């Protein structure tokens, strides 16, 4: 089957990009590709059989129909207007046309200098591309909306970060790379007609059912807000901290995008800060819902030329509703509740208080809880708490709540084990794969990718364990 590419963005939004070609790396070579995703997208295996160079995966060649562009956008970074930003090291190669008529962006990250590189070098490093590939695939298999990773290329091109590292490229796929920052760019340039063109493009390609509706813009922004709310609820329930929730890193489609200084919770710490550059803790774990709302408010401001204030406020309310509804549903599933009862939040918050006090592992606590037997007063989870009396009191109340459900242990455990993963991408697991890859050993990278495809299967090895001492509180930054 021949791959078919189109260029809707390039053809329909001429003010939003610069056309240019990728700049290949020195002695580039393909070290990993996503075989399952490639099969789903009918990408010929021969494209990955590159023995001389890195082909399209390293920006050395283009596939028929590709029309590369670097997109321009602006944004608020750490709550401050940063002005023009844009694709400083990434290039949208083209949009794959799928069988159902939809499209999929092929975005090459680390593709070289663009007009939007500012003071950067246009490059990505092996460390950051490995982290993003692992994180995006981990999130996908956890059921959380995300961009996807298709391939990684490394090279002999030296790139200076905190130390000198190997230049690399990541092929990232997404239904769209449209960001809140695209709208901000033209709003602050006082070009409202281009803001509206962006909204029209989004509706035409991603919500075509509303194209002819008189209230199409109201419906669209309300859905953007709702998707954002559901995404943040998913992050909070799985224990994911994005680390750099600038408006230019927010997806119009409600996807997790731009994996940098992210982190999955080890110990339960609601104030967890993944990004060591976030000195004020703006993007700490428990502040993510508030930041997402703030970002939506910035987006809403750009839409005031063609959406009434009342409609914008209704959409922002929809964010709160979607967030709380999804969060409640997810947490009840994690606790094994099939019905909603008024004291559920009390029980959940009591557990969180216990976990925070004891430094309990977030992922392992919920996974162990999912093996609870309703009639048994004992639990393997008990041994992980120092204050056994406090745990026993909570566990008695929890089992009493389970007895109000007309559901047997097997069905409840099955539900809980389908939403409480045994494995998440802890920073130390990613770092172990990175350390090996930087020495030329890609086995751990491939192994970890395979394991992350089955996060809900119990394991008795270190992929499901707490981090070793060296792996606790690893510092990551935007260069990660």
UniProtKB/Swiss-Prot annotation:
GO molecular function: AMPylase activity; ATP binding; magnesium ion binding
Gene name of this polypeptide: ydiU
Keywords noted in UniProt: ATP-binding, Magnesium, Manganese, Metal-binding, Nucleotide-binding, Nucleotidyltransferase, Transferase
Phylogenetic lineage: Bacteria, Pseudomonadati, Pseudomonadota, Gammaproteobacteria, Enterobacterales
Stated role: Nucleotidyltransferase involved in the post-translational modification of proteins. It can catalyze the addition of adenosine monophosphate (AMP) or uridine monophosphate (UMP) to a protein, resulting in modifications known as AMPylation and UMPylation.
Stated name of the protein: Protein nucleotidyltransferase YdiU
Residues at the active site: 248 (proton acceptor)
Catalytic reaction equation(s): L-seryl-[protein] + ATP = 3-O-(5'-adenylyl)-L-seryl-[protein] + diphosphate; L-threonyl-[protein] + ATP = 3-O-(5'-adenylyl)-L-threonyl-[protein] + diphosphate; L-tyrosyl-[protein] + ATP = O-(5'-adenylyl)-L-tyrosyl-[protein] + diphosphate; L-histidyl-[protein] + UTP = N(tele)-(5'-uridylyl)-L-histidyl-[protein] + diphosphate
Transmembrane intervals: none
